[in-house]
Amino acid sequence: MLFRSKFSELAKEMAKEYGFTTEVFDKAKIEELKMGGLLGVNQGSDTPPTFNVFTHKPEDAVNKQPLVLVGKGVMFDTGGYSLKPANYMTDMKTDMAGAAAVLATIMAVSANKLPYYVIGLVPATDNKVSANAFVVDDIITISDGTTVEIQNTDAEGRLVLADALAYAKQFKPELVIDLATLTGAAAAITSSFGIAMAGNNKNA
């Protein structure tokens, strides 16, 4: 399993090699930003969350406003108190595939010196069970003030993404794309032949 601290370390190494910048927010900074979704999911963990910001901004960028990529960084997902069956938990170390995709994209854009202003955001935690873990019927507050009543602790991806999407608004982005392993229902629909997509911009 890839711990979020190790993920951030790898990102910093890649940033040095390929030329993008990286900033890692610790728990104190996340609390200051009032990221209740990320903090709520992290309550059951014995290690703190991180929030990672990757930036590729060349001087010749063709876009003044950034393209923002948001990746779900749940490093291991037990489902929390809405516990997954054991056979569904086997591959949950890959629940950070969205985070990996965002980091890989930033790396590729920087390595190829593409003239695009791109920001990557990765909220990172795991979703575990403990005496402190969040439970069904808890009310949490996202960083933009939106309140959420928890009905299933295994819907944690939406919560961490909500804080990241709220954070992205400050950049006035040209386009936002989030990437996440959110539901097995998507695989039931597409199998291995595609991905489930939704959006509000037909021209994107």
Regions found by a protein language model. Give the residues of each.
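A generic structural signal for tightly packed, nonpolar segments enriched in small/aliphatic residues
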Residues: 7-204
